[in-house]
Curated annotation (Swiss-Prot):
It comes from Leptosphaeria maculans (strain JN3 / isolate v23.1.3 / race Av1-4-5-6-7-8). The active site is at residues 50, 89, 115. Keywords: Endoplasmic reticulum, Hydrolase, Membrane, Protease, Signal-anchor, Transmembrane, Transmembrane helix. Its EC number is 3.4.21.89. The gene is SEC11. It catalyses: Cleavage of hydrophobic, N-terminal signal or leader sequences from secreted and periplasmic proteins. This is Signal peptidase complex catalytic subunit SEC11. CDD domains: Peptidase_S24_S26.
Amino acid sequence: MLGVSGMQPRQLAAQILNFALVLSTAFMMWKGLSVVSDSSSPIVVVLSGSMEPAFQRGDLLFLWNRGLDTQVGEIVVYNVKGKDIPIVHRVVRRYGGGKTPLRLLTKGDNNIADDTELYATSQSFLTRKEDVVGSVVGFIPFVGYVTILLSENPWMKQVMLGLMGVMVVLQRE
């Protein structure tokens, strides 16, 4: 008995399980990085030019969230309440620390003004513990550009997923 494209059912099942193994391995690696870095998003892609020349659009950033004592000049990734896209900017001022919660003011290197306009409506600073996803500890230039292309061209995502599915089904062991 032959299945999809002349494959035996056992071969087809093996291919599907192989594909599931690849996906689950990637997921486990992501979760492992999240635990080690103490960050919900241990890797992010720069989506705009607001941090040029330090980081270009498409750079892949690695985050670390273990040290809660963020200094002025440090580059952090933060989430704004009510928005789902993380922002990568430099800390330009800090308030508090010690017994009082650490509050931060950020600004993009390529921006004229600080980020108070980007923060949530009732927010004039970031709370380190609640808003900051992590501090940038390393990067790989332009590797994340694939992510930008896929988000700006949704049809490319479907084509890539289709090609990956076809490759898994047609691959012979």
